[in-house]
Amino acid sequence: MGTKLPRKLEQKMQVVGEQIRLARLRRNLSIAQIAERVTCSPLTVSRIEKGVPTVAICIYLRVLYALQLDDDILLLAKEDAMGKAL
């Protein structure tokens, strides 16, 4: 499959990044403040907010934790209607 994501996944990454950005702004936090809490570079936080797919998931989790949104990760595949139907 290579490093290029299907367009649909790229769009979803951008939506996730935008949601993280909005959560940061609602909390009146700067990119630098999040980067300091997460112990990563401000550039990495910026990449997350832009939906760049090369950022490791552990960094996403640390950003969610810094925003007190880490429990939201538990919502992934929670219902899994298709899997339950199999």
Which residue stretches match the model-derived regions?
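Short alpha-helical DNA-recognition segment
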Residues: N28-S46
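Short, charged recognition helix plus adjacent turn
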Residues: L74-L86
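Short, basic-rich loop-to-helix N-cap that marks the start of a DNA-contacting helix
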Residues: V52-Y65
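The alpha-helix within a helix-turn-helix
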Residues: R24, A35, L64
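Residue-level signal for the short linker/turn that defines the boundary of a DNA-recognition helix
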Residues: E18, N28-L29, V55-C58
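A short, Lys/Arg-rich alpha-helix, primarily the initiator
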Residues: G2-R26
